[in-house]
């Protein structure tokens, strides 16, 4: 784990993905504020992301962490990897993720790696195409993880057995 990880007493793993300084130009000059992008997960399939904005960096990070805890989703994992290969996009960012065999590790870059680590995925091959803007990459990764379903839930929706859909 890197130095921007934190373990809370609730059992969540928190990661800071990005801190950005933004400026608003007013009559008297510029007003600088900070935005933070964070991801939070329990390492067992629950993961959330949030954005916060404030005049000070710690306050922006705190707001982002709270937003991430409110925005949690449950991901159906297949042990320590994904159920199947998937593509997802948000804005100009496109992501591709596929399951990997045991011992592969997380082969993913930047913002995608942070999301997959806190979600509890330990073996995955992932690639980001197009824009690598961390905000859009995190959104695209979340869209893909949210859309992923286990074979059991797909079979239940179709009224079939798991063996019949494979």
From Swiss-Prot:
GO term, biological process aspect, one: translation
InterPro entries, A to Z: Ribosomal_Su5_D2-typ_SF, Ribosomal_uS5, Ribosomal_uS5_bac-type, Ribosomal_uS5_C, Ribosomal_uS5_N, Ribosomal_uS5_N_CS, Ribsml_uS5_D2-typ_fold_subgr
GO MF annotations, alphabetized: rRNA binding; structural constituent of ribosome
Pfam families listed in its UniProt record: Ribosomal_S5 (PF00333), Ribosomal_S5_C (PF03719)
GO cellular component term of the entry, any: small ribosomal subunit
Cross-referenced NCBIfam families: rpsE_bact
PANTHER family membership: S5 DRBM DOMAIN-CONTAINING PROTEIN
Function: With S4 and S12 plays an important role in translational accuracy. Located at the back of the 30S subunit body where it stabilizes the conformation of the head with respect to the body.
Name of this chain's protein: Small ribosomal subunit protein uS5
Organism lineage string: Bacteria, Pseudomonadati, Pseudomonadota, Gammaproteobacteria, Pseudomonadales
């Amino acid at each position: 784990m890197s130095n921007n990880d934190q373990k809370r007493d609730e059992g969540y793993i928190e990661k800071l993905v990005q801190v950005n300084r933004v400026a608003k130009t007013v009559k008297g000059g510029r007003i600088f504020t900070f935005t933070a992008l964070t991801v939070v997960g329990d390492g067992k399939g629950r993961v959330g992301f949030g954005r916060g904005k404030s005049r000070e960096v710690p306050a922006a990070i705190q707001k982002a962490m709270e937003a991430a805890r409110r925005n949690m989703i449950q991901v159906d994992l297949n042990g320590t990897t994904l159920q199947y290969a998937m593509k997802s996009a948000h804005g100009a960012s496109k992501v591709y993720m596929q399951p990997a065999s045991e011992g592969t590790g997380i082969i993913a870059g930047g913002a995608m790696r942070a999301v997959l680590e806190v979600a509890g995925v330990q073996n995955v091959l992932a690639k980001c195409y197009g824009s690598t803007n961390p905000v859009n990459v995190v959104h695209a990764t979340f869209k893909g993880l949210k859309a992923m379903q286990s074979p059991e839930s797909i079979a239940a929706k179709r009224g079939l057995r798991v063996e019949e859909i494979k």
